[in-house]
């Protein structure tokens, strides 16, 4: 029997984290669909007081209606309006997002990008390692897949492009004892490689900022930066102040913002796709296609070999991404549940 050798590319969206939280039965206190609902619990780094999302700390977001406890649809509409305005501003000839602006949506954008960082740091600290171990012991589909690929000698490499800010993926791999490389940072020969084009709560400047002087800057100075200025620190704590925030909010069109680190990582994601051959596999997991940069995902799709094997894991088998994939690739399979993943690649 000839052993099949393949490279695996996995592209992940918010759905995998939602699936994990559902498995943990923590959907209420770790709500990844409504990003404002738990905003009053998020700590303000300067003094550790809960209430990051408040009139005092985020006046522009508050004026636009962002409140702890609001409904998901309203929260998503507020974020969509803010990011749409920021996208247009970032690509205009006189971008107000680059400097001080009196526009409430641009002010809200600067509040949002920083609030999201500390929201996900708060969520990360709420999930204990013992809980992740229980999920693995319970044979969660994604963890079973990672274990199989790690021990499969026919699998040459596993590259994971994730648009999630959280580090639940990295922590799961850590509990599994799987070594990985964070692309764009220190190189190593790990079989597993992770690429985060939209940033991460684990990315921070090497030199920390002054915690007591923490505040929201309403200009470009706190956004972007070169990759060389950043390190990966998975001991994410709210009192470790990064001088730059590299995270791009949901639906933020990354190529408009001219962030050096984001553009480099975005280009690397295309390169990962271009390297794949016919015998290789691509898995899209929990990617809505609406809450990420659609043009960025299209760039990955159009970089793939049309004969590559494509799998999608998403509860909605009639979603837009599936329609796009089926129009481009003939070798396409859709799974509605992650439980099936542990049984893949048994050949």
Region spans (language model):
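Gly/serine-rich nucleotide phosphate-binding loop at the start of the catalytic core
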Residues: 1-156
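Short secondary-structure boundary/capping segments
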Residues: 23-35, 174-180, 212, 299-300
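Acidic, metal/cofactor-coordinating or nucleic-acid-engaging core segments within structured domains
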Residues: 50, 220-277
């Amino acid at each position: 029997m000839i052993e099949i050798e393949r490279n695996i590319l996995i592209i992940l969206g918010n759905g995998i984290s939602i699936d994990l939280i559902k498995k943990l039965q923590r959907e209420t206190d770790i709500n990844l669909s409504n990003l404002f609902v738990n905003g009053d619990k998020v700590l303000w780094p300067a003094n550790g007081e809960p209430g990051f999302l408040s009139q005092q700390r985020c006046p522009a977001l508050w004026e636009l209606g962002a409140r702890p406890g609001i409904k998901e649809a309203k929260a998503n509409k507020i974020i969509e309006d803010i990011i749409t305005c920021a996208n247009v501003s970032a690509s205009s000839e006189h971008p107000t997002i680059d400097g001080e602006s009196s526009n409430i949506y641009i002010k809200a954008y600067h509040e949002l990008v920083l609030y999201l960082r500390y929201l996900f740091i708060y969520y990360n600290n709420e999930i204990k390692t013992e809980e992740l171990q229980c999920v693995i012991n319970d044979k969660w589909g994604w963890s079973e897949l990672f274990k199989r690929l790690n021990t499969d000698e026919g699998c040459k490499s596993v590259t994971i492009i994730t648009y999630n800010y959280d580090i639940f993926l990295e922590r799961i791999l850590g509990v599994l004892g799987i070594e990985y490389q964070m692309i764009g940072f220190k190189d190593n020969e790990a079989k597993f490689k992770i690429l985060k084009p939209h940033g991460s709560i684990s990315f921070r400047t090497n030199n920390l900022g002054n915690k007591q002087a923490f505040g929201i800057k309403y200009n470009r100075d706190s956004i972007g930066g070169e990759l060389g200025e950043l390190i990966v620190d998975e001991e994410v704590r709210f009192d470790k102040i990064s001088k730059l925030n590299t995270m791009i909010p949901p639906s933020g069109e990354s190529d408009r913002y001219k962030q050096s680190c984001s553009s480099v990582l975005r280009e690397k994601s295309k390169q990962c796709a271009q390297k794949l051959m016919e015998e290789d596999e691509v898995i899209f997991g929990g990617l809505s296609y609406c809450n990420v940069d659609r043009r960025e995902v299209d760039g990955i799709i159009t970089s793939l070999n049309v004969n590559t094997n494509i799998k999608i894991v998403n509860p909605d088998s009639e979603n837009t991404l599936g329609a796009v994939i089926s129009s481009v690739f003939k070798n396409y399979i859709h799974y509605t549940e992650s439980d099936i993943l542990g049984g893949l690649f048994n050949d």
